[in-house]
């Protein structure tokens, strides 16, 4: 029985895959970011507070399990844009010191207000359902 060997040029293969995958990865990262930002604006069912100066007015805080409410806009404004840190690796930094506390909570002090994990889960579900392409 005749046989053959296929030799793959790793650099050429990586370049071809990268060229096709990078736009898709960037679309996915932007879609995930948009889901997070959208979750901040959803109706909240927590307590009503007065906004600190200079914003003034009232706002309804998020209840445990809901995405954070927009109070000062700092978390919303510091949702970083995605960037490539390796050929097929996208990174996005949320440059707010309390983002992790809101996402994960603080035992005995603050219940989680997740906004990252639900967005990632939505992206994973769309990916698994074959809803690829332009997000």
Which stretches of residues belong to each language-model region?
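Short, Lys/Arg-rich flexible segments
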Residues: 1-135
């Amino acid at each position: 029985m005749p046989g053959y060997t296929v030799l793959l040029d790793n650099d050429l293969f990586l370049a071809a895959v990268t060229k096709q995958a990078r736009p898709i990865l960037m679309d996915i990262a932007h879609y995930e970011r948009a889901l997070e930002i959208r979750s901040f604006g959803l109706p909240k069912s927590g307590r009503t507070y007065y906004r600190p100066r200079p914003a003034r007015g009232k706002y309804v805080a998020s209840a445990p399990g809901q995405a954070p409410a927009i109070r000062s806009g700092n978390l919303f404004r510091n949702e970083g844009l995605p960037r490539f840190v390796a050929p097929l690796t996208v990174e996005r930094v949320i440059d707010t010191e309390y983002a992790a506390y809101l996402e994960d909570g603080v035992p005995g002090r603050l219940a989680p207000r997740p906004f990252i994990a639900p967005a990632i889960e939505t992206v994973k579900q769309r990916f698994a359902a074959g809803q690829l392409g332009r997000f």
